[in-house]
């Protein structure tokens, strides 16, 4: 989500909340708008990446109550590969430490992984396969067509000590074979909501001039062929994914506000 092409502002966050959106996750642009940063403690439905420094404002994950009364955990993660406005801690180390805490509260865990690197998001998917309900990639602004259900892979060589998970808090041992029955929904990038005929929401003409001349040009917004993109994920009663389906809804031109 962006306000004026640079991070989400407080007013737009509140507007989205009133429209019925339960949770907003933020990537490396989460601290771009001062009014949102100052009010993050009062806006718990807006999440900043969980692998930021300990004293960062806001929360990196939160529990929500579903319509059927179940508890759902949403986690925001920021990658480290490529160009990012924020310097995050290692997301793999963070998730390894955080998951046992969340799992004691609920098996329903959905994570948003904001990264510009496809390989980083795919690697995280294999790392978390069978351990969370869904991993939804974001950050590139372009939807991918690789949605799938993933499960943990067993090491059949007999030397797979890394595939045995020991919870010291509950004194339970879980092998990856037990995790195989649980599926994780995954997509490398769910896309964006905005102009489909654009360069990441920016007018193509300006971006063409920028690439041809090498001179930065402040991006101009465009409202051509506005679409809502995302994924529809169905979970079972144990926190596993049953299905994941890409969503793209084109908004009629008459319903789209035009820039002044």
Give the location of each predicted region.
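Acidic, metal/ion-coordinating pockets
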Residues: 1-260
